[in-house]
Curated annotation (Swiss-Prot):
Coiled-coil intervals: none
Pfam families documented for this protein: EF-G_D2, GTP_EFTU, IF-2, IF2_N
Record field: compositional bias (Polar residues): 111-121
Gene assigned in the entry: infB
Superkingdom per UniProt: Bacteria
Function: One of the essential components for the initiation of protein synthesis. Protects formylmethionyl-tRNA from spontaneous hydrolysis and promotes its binding to the 30S ribosomal subunits. Also involved in the hydrolysis of GTP during the formation of the 70S ribosomal complex.
Record's compositionally biased regions (Basic and acidic residues): 138-155, 168-188
Protein name: Translation initiation factor IF-2
Natural source organism: Coxiella burnetii (strain CbuG_Q212) (Coxiella burnetii (strain Q212))
Segments of this protein annotated with the region G5: 447-449
Annotated stretches, region: G2: 336-340
Single GO term (MF): translation initiation factor activity
Subcellular location: Cytoplasm
């Protein structure tokens, strides 16, 4: 019921305001003025006072007021709070007893029954009846405003009422506040939903939030793998992916929701968004494998040194090794240059030495670095007649990076122009000082052609090996490094493995990077099969699942299942990292490409004989790309050219290049039928030069302007046919007809066009030389003035090449 003033209530119950004030005073309500508002609680108190003042049976019957109302009550059971909409039937009888008990201690004075008191009682009865009717009328009016949706269940009504009656007054007040706040929402919900008492869970979900707003930012510890997508990163931080993309845009990186980012980038983003990154290493399988194998048990015994021969191209590295092995290895190399690593072991009178012959061409930097990585001693070959060259300096840098000692072999001393002292001087500028100059580097003059000084060189190598005290365990599971790998037709993937410790046997399970397999055959450097290989022994291994990457570590695993798991894990990780780098590079260049013109591309399908040559060729060809033309190697591999390679070239309009490999008969038929450009090469110089020529043809033509002559306007004539004719004096060069011209005024170009007519004494001429007057007609231009200059020039196309 709404609050009203005492005067309004008196008008409603049809009594005087003064009489009502007296009754309120008797009921203990502190209201002294007729304009004061009276609350619902004070009305109830007045009503109870009037009821208790009449104790007759009739009054008792009248004192039972039944209120039917629709109300939202809140019932709490444990942690749950349920709002239930009920229609209650209420009888006010119990508060009368409580009121009586409260008023028992107070002494009451009996009023004698007189005619005045009788009249007073009758008036009170009228007031009580009228007040009851007013209360019922207001209840009905409220019920009309909020029509009921469902009749009360007879069993639930008393139970809910009983629970409510046990609640304290404070909770009742909170219930009324809850009802007041949700009144409008409940009315809207009632209009559309069927009348039905909701379940406790659904009612709680609709009427109250299931969580509270955090008062402080939530800082989470985000576990980051080696690569993660933007969507997964957002989920780990419990934010939307758009927020992560915004944060990365602020950091200057453009990403998409499904793009993979590396661990370092993800850690920066997590810290930027206020969380703590936790880096996770996913190579647990590999760590467990290393822990399982542990240290190799056994006694370390002396082993042969692994010697890498380095130097500039054509300085005689392979010829030196050829003389040592007493074979003609050089004659088998195309063009007389080494294009992949050769691993050989040589038995000398002083002991065994394993040699690695690396290429000297600049494109084989990675192969040279790989050779220095798995070597003990570097023999630097320098031609006495050529001096220190760029690849010589690079070999010195590789040796220093690998922290291995260097022995300098000054080759070709048999030539008359040889100057070993000049070699020492040039090497000293690179901090390679000979022992006789106070340094620590051994120098040995040799001749790979006559054999002079070779025995002394071997002695120096073995002396250096004794100083290093090279030892290794010669039993147990083998470990090694892949020096080279290739795909052999008929034998499958072949890997040249240099054993560093342990002993490799036939049938061992070998894990090499992303490849694994059982060793089916081992072939020594002399071409003969062997059953085992110890430390410092190079062997060719057959039986791997694919061609491994040169430079990978090879390790013998006792369990094939474990080797398969690790290999597959490495393959997946390699793919994720490769995709992440590819997407990152693509998005970083997207805005750069928007402002550029179309870039011409030369697509290439590249096949090589060994993995090392393939890497060197790929790097060398990619270096040829410029801003205008680009080399795009769409596919590369080790082995012969197959029909699938040709079909790929047809689909992508590519050139097929084979380096020391050939196409089989069905593939050649397909090439001839489809007209695919197939080229074979065996020398890297020729391959790079041909690709340069092809790229030069893709370059946009470039024109050079050459000023032929300059004429100064002395007078202007008008012609009915041509228009303005400029009478000119040729001051420089020659003015020729049909050449492009520029009209200059105050040394500013105001028009570019074509020379339409050239006359001298009313005769058409082809050219006019310096110091001669002539008449010049400019095509489609009549605004020629005295004092202008007419510049005649010609354009010539310049042949462009790739540097």
């Amino acid at each position: 019921m709404a609050d009203m003033s005492v005067k309004q209530l008196a008008d409603l119950v049809r009594t005087t305001p003064e009489r009502l004030l007296e009754q309120l005073k008797e009921a203990g309500v502190a209201i002294t003025h007729v304009d004061q508002t009276i609350s619902d609680e004070e009305k109830r108190k007045l009503l109870l006072h009037l009821k208790t003042s009449h104790s007759t049976e009739t009054d008792k019957k009248r004192s039972k007021i039944v209120l039917k109302r629709k109300k939202l009550s809140v019932v709490k059971s444990g942690k749950k709070s349920v709002n239930v909409e009920i229609r209650s039937k209420r009888t006010y009888t119990k508060p009368v007893v409580e009121q009586k008990r409260e008023t028992e201690p107070a002494p009451t004075q009996e009023v004698p029954l007189t005619s005045d008191t009788t009249n007073l009682n009758e008036k009170a009865e009228v007031n009580v009846a009228t007040l009851e009717k007013a209360v019922e009328a207001e209840v009905k009016e409220e019920a009309k405003k909020t029509p009921s949706e469902k009749k009360e269940t007879p069993k639930k009504g008393p139970r809910k009422e009983t629970r409510r009656s046990r609640k304290p007054d404070k909770e009742d007040k909170w219930e009324r506040e809850e009802l007041h706040m949700t009144k409008l929402v409940e009315e809207r919900r009632r209009r559309h939903k069927p009348a039905h008492v909701p379940d406790s869970d659904s009612a709680s979900a609709k009427l109250e939030q299931g969580f509270a707003r955090p008062t402080a930012p939530v800082v989470r510890e985000v576990a980051l793998p080696e690569s993660i997508t933007v969507a997964d990163l957002a989920q780990k931080m419990s934010v939307k992916a758009a927020e992560v993309i915004k944060a990365m845009m602020k950091l200057g990186a453009m990403v998409t929701i499904n793009q993979r980012i590396d661990q370092e980038t993800a850690a920066i983003v997590v810290e930027e968004m206020g969380h703590k990154p936790k880096l996770i290493k996913e190579d647990v399988l590999e760590e467990n494998l290393v822990a399982t194998l542990g240290e190799q048990i056994g006694e370390a015994v002396p082993r042969a040194p692994v010697v890498t021969i380095m130097g500039h191209v054509d300085h005689g590295k392979t010829s030196l090794l050829d003389y040592i092995r007493r074979t003609k290895v050089t004659s088998t190399e195309a063009g007389g240059i080494t294009q992949h690593i050769g691993a050989y072991h040589v038995e000398t009178e002083l002991g065994m030495i394993t040699f690695l012959d690396t290429p000297g061409h600049e494109a084989f930097t990675a192969m040279r670095a790989r050779g220095a990585k798995c070597t003990d001693i570097v023999v630097l070959v320098v031609a006495a007649d050529d001096g220190v060259m760029p690849q010589t300096v690079e070999a010195i840098q590789h040796a220093r990076a690998a922290k291995v000692p260097v022995v300098v072999a000054v080759n070709k001393i048999d030539k008359p122009e040889a100057d070993p002292e000049r070699i020492k001087t040039e090497l000293s500028t690179h901090d390679v000082l000979p022992e006789e100059w106070g340094g620590d580097t051994m120098f040995q003059p040799i001749s790979a052609k006559t054999g002079e000084g070779i025995d002394a060189l071997l002695e120096r190598i073995l002396l250096q090996a004794e100083v290093l005290e090279l030892k290794a365990v010669d039993n147990g599971p083998a470990r090694g490094m892949v020096v080279e790998s290739r795909l052999d037709r008929g034998r499958g993937p072949v890997a040249t493995v240099l054993v560093t410790s342990g002993e490799l046997h036939l049938g061992d399970i070998l894990l090499v990077g992303r490849e694994y397999g059982r060793v089916r055959a081992m072939i020594g450097d002399d071409g003969r099969p062997c059953e085992s290989a110890g430390p410092s022994m190079p062997v060719e291994v057959l039986g791997l699942s694919g061609t491994p990457v040169a430079g990978e570590e090879a390790i013998v695993v006792p369990d094939e299942r474990k080797a398969r798991e690790i290999a597959r894990f490495r393959q997946g990780k390699y793919r994720e990292v490769r995709l992440a780098k590819k997407q990152t590079a693509h998005l970083e260049r997207i805005f750069d490409r928007m402002g550029e013109g179309k870039q011409n591309t030369l697509n290439i399908v590249l096949k090589a004989d060994v993995q090392g040559s393939l890497e060197a060729l790929t790097e060398a060809l990619n270096k040829l790309s410029t801003d205008e033309v680009k080399v795009n190697i769409i596919a590369s591999g080790v082995g012969g050219i197959t029909e699938s390679d040709v079909n790929l070239a047809i689909a992508s309009d590519a050139v097929v290049i084979g380096f020391n490999v050939r196409a089989d008969a069905p593939t050649r038929v397909l090439v001839e039928r489809e007209g695919v450009d197939l080229r074979y090469y065996s020398i890297i110089y020729d391959l790079i030069d041909e690709v340069k020529k092809a790229l030069s043809g893709l370059l946009a033509p470039e024109f050079e302007e050459k000023i032929v002559g300059l004429a100064e306007v002395r007078d202007v004539f008008r012609s009915s046919k041509i228009g303005a004719i400029a009478g000119c004096m040729v001051v420089e060069g020659v003015v020729r007809r049909h050449l492009p011209i520029r009209v200059l005024r105050d040394n500013v170009v105001i028009y570019e066009g074509q020379l339409e007519s050239l006359r001298r004494y009313k005769e058409d001429v082809a050219e006019v030389r310096q110091g001669t007057e002539c008449g010049i007609g400019v095509k489609n231009y009549n605004d020629v003035k005295v004092g202008d200059q007419i510049e005649v020039y010609e354009k010539t196309q310049v042949h462009r090449t790739i540097a």
